[in-house]
Amino acid sequence: MARSTVLTPEDEATPAVRHARWQDYFQLMKPRVMSLVVFTALTGLLAARTPIHPLLGAVAVLCIAIGAGASGALNMWYDADIDAKMRRTRGRPVPMGLVKGEEAATLGVVLSLLSVMLMGMAINWLAAGLLAFTIVFYAVVYTMWLKRWTAQNIVIGGLAGALPPAIGWAAATGHAPLNAWLMVLIIFLWTPPHFWALSLYISTDYAKAGVPMLPVVKGAKETRKQILLYSLALIPVCLAPAFTGLGGWLYLAVSGLGGLVFLTLAVRVFRSLAGEASDPRPADRDLYEVGEAAAKRGKPVGDAKHARNLFAFSILYLFALFAALLAEAVLGLPILNLHVLELPL
């Protein structure tokens, strides 16, 4: 797919009314995504339950935050053409003309080098290597290749967003055992139903931008099926830390109850097309517009309602899982000793 950094006629017709501010450069770093990355990395660092000097711990988290910001800046530089075509992203600094593409790219490269080198010299090179791999995988493999060429883009590309707990654990201990990778697996399996729920009700947005998200390529019915399948795989994996010497009773309760809600919402999404004779593609049915109109009335309906509910709860569920692990580590709560599957710490 050819790539162009030229703004749309609509954007070009509206000149920038101000120079870039520091907030615009900060937005390049995707602060909301960065906050989730930092949170899961911090959980990994503390869940290792290995003493680490507070200053070194802070430096490690800072490096991970900078690395996440670097990935975001590189993504916004390369995806400026796509972002300009989508309602959800056209207000970003580069397509708006507030920050030049080359400035975003330069910021991303500089922050990437800074975060990896600082992590290696101040913490350890295993954590630095994992951080470097994460940045390259997200900025190059996902952004420049997978996102534009395959409907499995967020499945494979989700590895980049799943790695921060392992980076945090490696920063604290100098190694990354199976329990660290179990946290990675949780995020990896959580990513597809999370993003596919979003893509269900903005599928036309993706279609107009030429992004081959699953609903665009395979349709809504197949997407709902995949959401349910990944949800069925996710729930037992989320329960696993309680049986591997990683989580305690608090985590078991949160993962169990939250998992039931998550699975219930996924089933509702799956059943929302039951009995339909056809599987309308985005060109025939704009779920984004349907959902927006319904939301304004205060009564989201049908596809938009169920997809929105799952998308919103998926964020809460992931946060609750890692918050439970974090709370148990900080408070020194005992882990369960069920001896079902003992993984090395």
UniProtKB/Swiss-Prot annotation:
Keyword Transmembrane: yes
EC class: transferase
GO cellular component: plasma membrane
InterPro entries referenced in this protein's UniProt entry, alphabetically: Protohaem_IX_farnesylTrfase, UbiA_prenyltransferase, UbiA_prenylTrfase_CS, UbiA_sf
Coarse class of the protein's main subcellular location: membrane
GO MF annotations, alphabetized: protoheme IX farnesyltransferase activity
Membrane topology: Multi-pass membrane protein
Subcellular localization(s) per the UniProt record: Cell inner membrane
EC number from the UniProt entry: 2.5.1.141
Keywords of this entry: Cell inner membrane, Cell membrane, Heme biosynthesis, Membrane, Transferase, Transmembrane, Transmembrane helix
TM regions (residue ranges): 33-53, 54-74, 105-125, 126-146, 154-174, 182-202, 226-246, 247-267, 315-335
GO biological process: heme O biosynthetic process
Pathway per the UniProt entry: Porphyrin-containing compound metabolism; heme O biosynthesis; heme O from protoheme: step 1/1
Other known facts: Carbon 2 of the heme B porphyrin ring is defined according to the Fischer nomenclature.
Family designation: Belongs to the UbiA prenyltransferase family. Protoheme IX farnesyltransferase subfamily.
Function as written in the Swiss-Prot or TrEMBL entry: Converts heme B (protoheme IX) to heme O by substitution of the vinyl group on carbon 2 of heme B porphyrin ring with a hydroxyethyl farnesyl side group.
Protein name (database record): Protoheme IX farnesyltransferase
The species this protein was found in: Caulobacter sp. (strain K31)
Name of encoding gene: ctaB
